[in-house]
Amino acid sequence: LHGSVWKTIDDATNQPRALVRFSQDKNGVLSANIEKILVPSEANKCTMCEGTYKNKSLIGLTIVKNLKNVGQNKYDKGSILDPQSDKTYRFSVTVSPDGEKLTARGYIGISAIGRNQTWYRVK
């Protein structure tokens, strides 16, 4: 995942939300930052956000932290920030065999109780 850029899709509206870029530290731990907002009305400031991020730019914001490779195309043990709700969730990722899609899963407690989003690789 290191260096790759992904288009996030809102699971409620099925519309593109942002581009995020993954990076990896020297220990192999991944994080991801928002590189671009794809919703024109939210490009400069997040008017839909609550709390900390209301009316602030989200460009450069680290939304994924501490994601670790746990097997072929599988990453887990991370966290993801939802700036709109100002909440942080546990986070895991499974990359498709062709490397073009990933299933992002955010959850509280156990993974069985959570939500999936499909993100698409940007070349």
Where do the PLM segments sit?
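Hydrophobic core segments of beta-strands in well-ordered, beta-rich domains
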Residues: 33, 104-105
